[in-house]
Amino acid sequence: MSAKTDEILESLKTLTLLEAAELVKQIEEAFGVSAAAPVGGVVVAAAAGAAAEAVEEKTEFDVVLEEVPADKKIAVLKVVRGITGLGLKEAKDLVEAAPKPIKEGVSKDDAEAAKKELEEAGAKVSVK
């Protein structure tokens, strides 16, 4: 660094926050630039967009009925009917055909709620 830039740097270190903000405004006006949009901002925004897409891919979950103990079949059948809206025969076929997906493409909250209900009824459930 040259002596001149060292001297400017030392002067800047002594400025208060209010004085520094005023200096920024004066520099923006004098040189016709803006301190609000840094050059790397575009790269950061693009990276944030890619990260958001990765998160979006994980917003849909499948609730899979893995196993139903014989003594819990009726309780699980009632819960499956409530969750899916299926008729008695369709729900019975689904429960007896485990492992089978109960709900597909649902939100994480819905998937966790369904899993909790099914587990309370005695079923073994996974969320994928």
UniProtKB/Swiss-Prot annotation:
<dbReference type="GO" id="GO:0003729">
    <property type="term" value="F:mRNA binding"/>
</dbReference>
<keyword id="KW-0689">Ribosomal protein</keyword>
<dbReference type="GO" id="GO:0006412">
    <property type="term" value="P:translation"/>
</dbReference>
<dbReference type="InterPro" id="IPR000206">
    <property type="entry name" value="Ribosomal_bL12"/>
</dbReference>
<dbReference type="InterPro" id="IPR013823">
    <property type="entry name" value="Ribosomal_bL12_C"/>
</dbReference>
<comment type="similarity">
    <text>Belongs to the bacterial ribosomal protein bL12 family.</text>
</comment>
<dbReference type="Pfam" id="PF00542">
    <property type="entry name" value="Ribosomal_L12"/>
</dbReference>
<comment type="subunit">
    <text>Homodimer. Part of the ribosomal stalk of the 50S ribosomal subunit. Forms a multimeric L10(L12)X complex, where L10 forms an elongated spine to which 2 to 4 L12 dimers bind in a sequential fashion. Binds GTP-bound translation factors.</text>
</comment>
<dbReference type="GO" id="GO:0022625">
    <property type="term" value="C:cytosolic large ribosomal subunit"/>
</dbReference>
<dbReference type="InterPro" id="IPR008932">
    <property type="entry name" value="Ribosomal_bL12_oligo"/>
</dbReference>
<dbReference type="Pfam" id="PF16320">
    <property type="entry name" value="Ribosomal_L12_N"/>
</dbReference>
<dbReference type="InterPro" id="IPR036235">
    <property type="entry name" value="Ribosomal_bL12_oligo_N_sf"/>
</dbReference>
<dbReference type="GO" id="GO:0003735">
    <property type="term" value="F:structural constituent of ribosome"/>
</dbReference>
<dbReference type="InterPro" id="IPR014719">
    <property type="entry name" value="Ribosomal_bL12_C/ClpS-like"/>
</dbReference>
<protein>
    <recommendedName>
        <fullName>Large ribosomal subunit protein bL12</fullName>
    </recommendedName>
</protein>
<comment type="function">
    <text>Forms part of the ribosomal stalk which helps the ribosome interact with GTP-bound translation factors. Is thus essential for accurate translation.</text>
</comment>
<keyword id="KW-0687">Ribonucleoprotein</keyword>
